[in-house]
Amino acid sequence: MVRLLGIDPGLRFTGWGLVDVDGNRLCHVADGVIATDGDAPVPERLRCLHDSLLDLVRRYGPREAAVEETYVNRNGASTLKLGYARGVALLVPALAGIAVSEYGAMAVKRAVVGTGAASKDQVEMMVRRLLPGATIRRADASDALAVAICHAHHRASALRVSAGTRMA
């Protein structure tokens, strides 16, 4: 069994979700949202995000992590700030020795729903279906669980390819 941490980074709200994977079985462990004070200076918000993610890594001990890639919007300042949060989300697990993968939003939607054009509601519905018993309170947490599920699917495919290569 492998524990995966999915992260949907944001400077105001960062979603996180933990999933245990055993073969093709997924089991919800925990999820939530890290909220930073929107009135605080950016460095303080990044420190809050760092400390909270570090606490999650220490508390739950994931073996692998996956982070959603940043989309670029028209507001360059917002995109840059999102990039700061994403950097923290990539760095914390990496410093803990955890392998980190990255997935774009369309890849996550395709892995969870079957189409890269899925709506947020469709993604959340499938996350709830794939992880029965998960009590998801915010869309950010649902997105993070979707990132973890996406990584589980990609990981399983890579393991099958690797096993096939060894047998040949």
Curated annotation (Swiss-Prot):
Binding residue positions for Mg(2+) 2: 68
Enzyme category, top tier: hydrolase
Record key words, sorted: Cytoplasm, DNA damage, DNA recombination, DNA repair, DNA-binding, Endonuclease, Hydrolase, Magnesium, Metal-binding, Nuclease
CC annotations in GO: cytoplasm; Holliday junction resolvase complex
PROSITE patterns in UniProt: RUVC
GO molecular function: crossover junction DNA endonuclease activity; DNA binding; magnesium ion binding
UniProt remark on cofactor binding: Binds 2 Mg(2+) ion per subunit.
Top-level taxon: Bacteria
Keyword DNA repair part of the UniProt annotation: yes
Subcellular localization: Cytoplasm
Keyword Glycoprotein listed: no
InterPro entries named in the record: RNaseH-like_sf, RNaseH_sf, X-over_junc_endoDNase_Mg_BS, X-over_junc_endoDNase_RuvC
Required cofactor(s): Mg(2+)
Transmembrane segments: none
Binding site for Mg(2+) 1: 8, 140
Signal peptide: none
Positions annotated as active site in the UniProt record: 8, 68, 140
Broad class of the protein's primary localization: cytoplasm
UniProt cross-references to NCBIfam families, sorted A to Z: ruvC
Function according to Swiss-Prot or TrEMBL: The RuvA-RuvB-RuvC complex processes Holliday junction (HJ) DNA during genetic recombination and DNA repair. Endonuclease that resolves HJ intermediates. Cleaves cruciform DNA by making single-stranded nicks across the HJ at symmetrical positions within the homologous arms, yielding a 5'-phosphate and a 3'-hydroxyl group; requires a central core of homology in the junction. The consensus cleavage sequence is 5'-(A/T)TT(C/G)-3'. Cleavage occurs on the 3'-side of the TT dinucleotide at the point of strand exchange.
PANTHER family per UniProt: CROSSOVER JUNCTION ENDODEOXYRIBONUCLEASE RUVC
Protein name as it appears in the record: Crossover junction endodeoxyribonuclease RuvC
Protein's organism: Gluconacetobacter diazotrophicus (strain ATCC 49037 / DSM 5601 / CCUG 37298 / CIP 103539 / LMG 7603 / PAl5)
Gene behind the chain: ruvC
